[in-house]
């Protein structure tokens, strides 16, 4: 059989109150229970939205909208969502066992229209282990998760192998996939189909009779023309008797259900409370013992924590004292590092300034040379300018003289004049007023000798000047170097100081070379000193931890002793660990074994109960599974024999029934064809003529006529001949006797009567011998006698058949019980008792726990000793390598000595660094300081004076030479007057004058340019001197600041300072870390002590309270046990499998049973009062009284004429067997009565008959549905009279209207419309065309009228309208109609989808509190019979006993609203298979 698809779960993501909630849907009924606003309607709205994601249809009304012409703007969906991405998903499993997840992504659209965006999607191939919430959420941390958008969901699913994700752009495609996969019952091709589907769901959701559906039932229930199907003959008359019988069975079944309900619920109610009290008593005893153990353990823990607190407080005080010293040392180290870094920066500046000073010194020297060269060039330019001036003056004078010389006289005259001028100039220059031309030669020799002497003197001075200038510059340079190194001093002291400085420089340079070795040595010694101090600190700490002072010589022996102790303790700890592991492993194995036994115990107990029941039913004792299988084989053999005997009796009974039916025919005809032939031939049956024969004569006449006793007596055989031609519908042998039926006698035969026989002489050569029959059937009296005997035999056979059927049913039920036992319990039924083993294991577990506790205490002590020894060895491992340091007492003195030497070397290094360059420059020129060139200025003046004297002597000699040369010109005195101008000479002189003036101008410009350049050179020199002086001053300031800092600024000083600071920082950090750890541990220890103190007080209080409670409860429990044993109900109540359930589960089980019992005994005053009294939780014995009262009540109600037992449980089993037998018998009878109808000629009539039969089949499923006063619901389908007349004319009188159908101008539809108008002229067709009317007439649905009727109370059958029914009745009736519609859709769509698909079937019901318990139960039975899932929303006062119930409570926590959901499985037992078979029988027969 194809399994029906089921909705597995509904998942809501980010809905109002539901962030990520999955509701597992029951296979039948899922109940959403909760108060107003709990979220029931929101859950159903999410389901409907995923089923029909059409915003044009979705409208979740609210009761506050009553009377409003339009709903809220968002139609109830926008407000049910939260901001962001939301999902609603349905997890389904179809008939092919394919898992399909369909759903929609919803998101609020911003704006005042409050719109919602919906995107449908489907997921196929998803593994069963993957939950829907895992797909659409991503966990961020333990308390946060986010909802994945649709694109991320698609990427996530595409990454999973075998999983298909489909997103739909149209709702039609979405619904098409759902139809093909068997999720919805009908293919929704258009918006109209979706609207019908939504109206169906909406009517189901809000309950009641939907006018939208009832007005258009034909559209919902009747499919379109889909071909011709066979029709079935109306079985109403044949089924009426069965229904009446089944009604009687239902009445009896109600008693059976009441018995079963009362027993099961009373047993659950009392047994759950009984076992809960038993469990609680055991739990209280265990808790009291556990409290006592915990009290002892907590006292020990408190003492240990107090000791620990004292130790940690002492250590914390020590660390607090050491932290101040470490902070001071660390601050000092940080300040020292800052000073070193500052000194290094100062040293870098000093080096940089010294480099700059060296560069400035070089540039200054170069600039001095440049200035000196510029001065020399300036002097040359001045001399050149002066010579140019002299030449211009001379040319001007010559031009003036030569202007008068026009001829030779003029030349002589000019010469004369020049000679006179030269003589005058010579007088002037030589200071010889008496000089004459004649004496000039004498004076020339004198002045030439004087010039030579002046020249020699000048050259000598020039040589001295050059040498003095060189010595003067070296002396100044050496003197400045000495001043720079030593400071101001007298010039005469420079030589001695310079020699002393050079000797000191050699010594300082030698010391400076020792800086690096000394620094390395100091660093090494300081490191050893720190290690020595660290070793001393470690030794002091070790002695403090050991509580004893040790000498250095004792440490190695102590180390060996501790290592030996560690080795021994390590072995002990190792062995203890192995022993503890073995104990824990055994404990875990015991615990695992106990858990497995506790899980197996309920199964074993259930198997034992089942085995005991089987033993009681069959009266056998079974000791092994082989006994069970052997007995099952015997049972099968007995069942086979009983079935064979029952079938034989049934066959005989059927034969008797057929014979009675045959003998009951009027006229005694055993063949109906004989009556028809007799009527056709105009004769009478021979059996009718002899119908009044007596019972005594009946054997004679039966033997007399023999086979011809069924003959037909006709008046004339000749008239029959023509009828015999072609006769086929007759018996194989047909006897005809000619005679008068009114006066017929037996004279037609020649007869000889014998004893109990006759001989009939048929002809001369043919006789017939016939004996008298033992059971004559000739004549009415014989037949009646036979019928009477057959009835008696039939009664015997019926009773025997019933007995055999009962035995078969009982054997089958026993066989089924054995089969269930073999399938469920055989594997564990004959195993050892797990409870006995659990008791043994628990005792062993207690021993192990005690051993583990003792072992842990011993191991803890060893571990503490091991840790102490290990810490000691660790400390010694750090101390022993430093023993030589601890023994070195002179290390600190050596460090101080090396530090002093390093200071001296560093001072020397600073001296060398500061004055090394000056000393290097001073060393090669120090000898110039021996003599001071003080006469350099006088020499310089003498040199200038000798230059001037040499120049004057040269001019005097030149002037005298010129006079001597012009001595002849003096004789031209007479030609002076005769001078005349010579223009040519004049012009030449003028040209030379212009050239001389141009040269003079150039000389002047060059002099001015060079003067400006000289001025620039002097400015640059002054700037360089100023920069040099400034830099020098800054360098001196920096050197003074470096000396003021007082820190050695060498290359490794910063690294040593940083290492020292980091070491102190590490020590300070470690100290602080340890101090913080101790503070935290101390705080934790104090808190732990406080907690232990509070725990001790609470444990003491709980222990005494629990002890008092155990003592108090003992008296009540003894009373309960006494009452249970006195009434013999311990076997019913002491259900050991319930001992393994929790108290909450048992209390829930008892509460559910109590709710069901309140409804069950509502009509019984006695049981109601006893039940009310039993609800007192302080009086558990009253529940036992109620259970005894229920049993007594049921014993009184057992019908002893039907069921012969005093035990209500056995009575229920026998009643189930009897009802199953009756149901099976009536079902088989109904199947025999179902005969096929005659086929009809018209396709419309056949289709109508088919759909009428289908509606009748739907009605059969609703006949037993009752809601309140409504006893039954049915759907009436009638053919309209006008259309029925049209069908009759079409099938039988169509020849009369051939003018319409043979017309070429009319189509068939139009001809059909014309015929309809012709037959019904009184009907106004309106504006519709014949074509439209004809198309409507071709649709068989227009021939039918449908309406829903209910059988309500004394009113009988009436039309189902909401105004005539109560709210609950309207809900139940509307639900019945919807079930019919769903079944109709499935039948219609079966041919469209796969043959192996049976679609899901689910409806809703909101606010189910309007239905009473009987109506709810009816819905449950309807769902079970129709394999339909139902989602019910009900307040908290409804607690269905079947299906799955979700308790919804909406809560607000920290401004966050969420719905708390608790799911409960149904606790009512399932209906037996035979009853389910009875319920399904009508639909199978249909």
Curated annotation (Swiss-Prot):
<dbReference type="GO" id="GO:0005524">
    <property type="term" value="F:ATP binding"/>
</dbReference>
<dbReference type="GO" id="GO:0006260">
    <property type="term" value="P:DNA replication"/>
</dbReference>
<keyword id="KW-0547">Nucleotide-binding</keyword>
<keyword id="KW-0159">Chromosome partition</keyword>
<comment type="similarity">
    <text>Belongs to the SMC family. MukB subfamily.</text>
</comment>
<comment type="subunit">
    <text>Homodimerization via its hinge domain. Binds to DNA via its C-terminal region. Interacts, and probably forms a ternary complex, with MukE and MukF via its C-terminal region. The complex formation is stimulated by calcium or magnesium. Interacts with tubulin-related protein FtsZ.</text>
</comment>
<dbReference type="GO" id="GO:0003677">
    <property type="term" value="F:DNA binding"/>
</dbReference>
<dbReference type="GO" id="GO:0030261">
    <property type="term" value="P:chromosome condensation"/>
</dbReference>
<dbReference type="GO" id="GO:0009295">
    <property type="term" value="C:nucleoid"/>
</dbReference>
<feature type="coiled-coil region">
    <location>
        <begin position="444"/>
        <end position="480"/>
    </location>
</feature>
<dbReference type="Pfam" id="PF13558">
    <property type="entry name" value="SbcC_Walker_B"/>
</dbReference>
<keyword id="KW-0067">ATP-binding</keyword>
<dbReference type="InterPro" id="IPR050308">
    <property type="entry name" value="MukB/SMC"/>
</dbReference>
<dbReference type="InterPro" id="IPR007406">
    <property type="entry name" value="MukB_N_dom"/>
</dbReference>
<protein>
    <recommendedName>
        <fullName>Chromosome partition protein MukB</fullName>
    </recommendedName>
</protein>
<feature type="coiled-coil region">
    <location>
        <begin position="509"/>
        <end position="603"/>
    </location>
</feature>
<dbReference type="InterPro" id="IPR027417">
    <property type="entry name" value="P-loop_NTPase"/>
</dbReference>
<keyword id="KW-0132">Cell division</keyword>
<comment type="function">
    <text>Plays a central role in chromosome condensation, segregation and cell cycle progression. Functions as a homodimer, which is essential for chromosome partition. Involved in negative DNA supercoiling in vivo, and by this means organize and compact chromosomes. May achieve or facilitate chromosome segregation by condensation DNA from both sides of a centrally located replisome during cell division.</text>
</comment>
<feature type="coiled-coil region">
    <location>
        <begin position="977"/>
        <end position="1115"/>
    </location>
</feature>
<feature type="coiled-coil region">
    <location>
        <begin position="1209"/>
        <end position="1266"/>
    </location>
</feature>
<dbReference type="InterPro" id="IPR032520">
    <property type="entry name" value="MukB_hinge"/>
</dbReference>
<feature type="coiled-coil region">
    <location>
        <begin position="835"/>
        <end position="923"/>
    </location>
</feature>
<feature type="region of interest" description="Flexible hinge">
    <location>
        <begin position="666"/>
        <end position="783"/>
    </location>
</feature>
<keyword id="KW-0963">Cytoplasm</keyword>
<dbReference type="GO" id="GO:0007059">
    <property type="term" value="P:chromosome segregation"/>
</dbReference>
<dbReference type="Pfam" id="PF04310">
    <property type="entry name" value="MukB"/>
</dbReference>
<dbReference type="Pfam" id="PF16330">
    <property type="entry name" value="MukB_hinge"/>
</dbReference>
<dbReference type="GO" id="GO:0005737">
    <property type="term" value="C:cytoplasm"/>
</dbReference>
<keyword id="KW-0175">Coiled coil</keyword>
<dbReference type="GO" id="GO:0051301">
    <property type="term" value="P:cell division"/>
</dbReference>
<keyword id="KW-0238">DNA-binding</keyword>
<dbReference type="InterPro" id="IPR012090">
    <property type="entry name" value="MukB"/>
</dbReference>
<dbReference type="InterPro" id="IPR042501">
    <property type="entry name" value="MukB_hinge_sf"/>
</dbReference>
<keyword id="KW-0226">DNA condensation</keyword>
<keyword id="KW-0131">Cell cycle</keyword>
<feature type="coiled-coil region">
    <location>
        <begin position="326"/>
        <end position="418"/>
    </location>
</feature>
<feature type="binding site">
    <location>
        <begin position="34"/>
        <end position="41"/>
    </location>
    <ligand>
        <name>ATP</name>
    </ligand>
</feature>
